[in-house]
Each structure stands twice: as structure tokens, then as C-alpha cells.
Amino acid sequence: MKAADITLREARIEDAAFVADLDTALRPEDPQDPVIYEDYWRNPDESSKVERFIGELEGTRVAYASQRHTNWKTSTRYGGVGGDVLPAQRTPERLDGLFTAMEDRSRADGAQTFTTWAWEDDDLRLQVLTKRGYREERRQRFWELDLVANRAKLEAMAAASREKMREQHITVLTIDRDDDPEKFTKLWRMSNEAEQDVPTTVPHVEGAFEDFMKWMRSPGLREDRIWIARDGDRVLGVSILSYPPKRGVVQTDWTGVGRAGRGKGVARALKCETVMQAIALGVDKVRTDNDFKNAPILHINDTMGYRRRPDGIQLMRGA
């Protein structure tokens, strides 16, 4: 399969590290971890189909492309397409070729709408996508929190949140300290409920428990760093920081609160515990990202001292 002058072949597990290196080369300020990439490739989501390809020039790897979609459980069939090229070989023609190839495969699978992402400061990619007919659909806000500069503020917020949780008889603890044998099942159900209320254009598809546990066992997560909130028998919420084992910045993997836990300050309490733990572990900064219309969590980020980074833009076009 060709993409401009690039030859595409099916990706193999051992190519995951190359893709992490490619993404890191494109945005050195946002290094990606090859260990996490490889684990993600080895443990696909059973509710989705994904195809990955490596692009070569004269036998040398220079590009990556993919197309993925859920198992068509929603009324509108959204196909995710993407790809990129190493900086030295990155041209509009090659990017355009990658999207042409992936759109063709996605369309053949039955996609009705293509969706992809670009950073707001990636002019070349945005120009290519605009010429292909893509239009901005929504944005993802990206943030960074300086744990050194904001330590005093965060300590005060954490103390206030702990008191508020005590007053409401809500227990906040890491999941390794929870002796409930059903804790992961309850966490999975709560997370699915919380995810349904996150603003989105592409509908959320409830994930299987087996896929959830693959994620819980992924290299960046540890049970002693997964914070949950409980009210008696119920799991109300969760907040998790991912710690890249090889390279990268510590960042939020997921913060979610079920409907029974909202309006109680649970999300703030959980996020405070994750960052206080990060400080104790010697981390100097953490990052997070949220949908641009998720007002409650955006407000928490602002009050904690997070500062904006470039947005991610979701773009769509008809197939």
C-alpha cells in the first residue's frame, strides 16, 4: 500500500517503540513512553477494531498510520484515522497520502464520518486536514501544574478537602488498601457511568470489564497510586496519575465521579491526593487534559493552579 512515495506495511509489536520515538520527535516537550505504547498495542480493546501501519522510504521507517473504530454499536459510524511522519521527512504530500490511505480503509469498513486530531499549533497538519475537508468539531484542553511553585496552595487545598470528606463520612484511599473483593468491579461500573457524562461528539461505548482490567494493569499505573472515594459500600469516584516507566511527564490518566458522588467535592479531594502523592515521590510537575466543555473539572484545574498548554483539536468530515 502506498501513501505518496511512502510504502505502508502492517505494523508489528516491535514497531511500537518507533512510533513512541516518532511522536516524541514531533513534540519533544511531550515525550512518549515506548513501554506504555507497546503494552497498549499488546492489549487491544475487544470492543474496537484497529489497524496500524508503518511507512518506509527505501526500507527505513519514517511514518506511522492507523485507522480504528468501535464495533459499530452507535447509530453514526465514526472512524478514527491518523498518521504522521518524522520531522526530517514530513511534507504536506506525505501527510495527505497517509490520510488518503487510512480514509480508504475506514470507509471500506463502513465509516460514515472520519475523525482525527491535531495540535492547535501544528500548522502543517491543520492545513492538510482543512484541504481534505475536515472542520473543527471540539477541543481538548491540555494543562500543566507546577508542583514546586504551587505546593503551599495544594497542601492547603488537600487539608480542606480531607476535612470536607471526613464531615461527609467519605473515605479516600488508594485501591491497594481497600479490602472489598468487588472493588474493581465497582470501580469499572462507576467509571463507565462517569464517562457517559463527559462531553463528546463520538458517543462513549461502555467498555468490558476485561478491557478495564488490562488498563488497570498497564505499566504506568500502580494500585498504590490509584485513589478512590468510598461511601460505605459504594465507590463514588477515582483519580489516577500515570507514571511513565521509561520517559515522559506524569499525567492524569482518568478522574471520574459517579452520579451518586457529585456535588460533594469528591473530584477535588481525589485530585488533591494524587498530586500530594506525586510531590512526596519527588515529581515536579503533572499534566492533564479535559474536554473544553467539561466545566466542573476545568474549574478545579484552574483553582489548583494548572496552566494552559496548546489545545488538541478534534476535526471531522463526512466519509
What is each residue range found by the language model?
Residues 91-104, 257, 263-276, 299, ...:
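Conserved acetyl-CoA-binding loop-helix of GNAT-fold acetyltransferases
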Residues 236-257, 262-277, 281-287:
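Extended hydrophobic/aromatic segments used for targeting, binding, or gating
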Residues 132-154, 225, 252, 276-319:
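Active-site/acyl-donor-binding loops of N-acyltransferases
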Residues 13-16, 23-121, 230-258, 318:
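Conserved donor-binding loop and adjoining core beta-sheet/short helix segment
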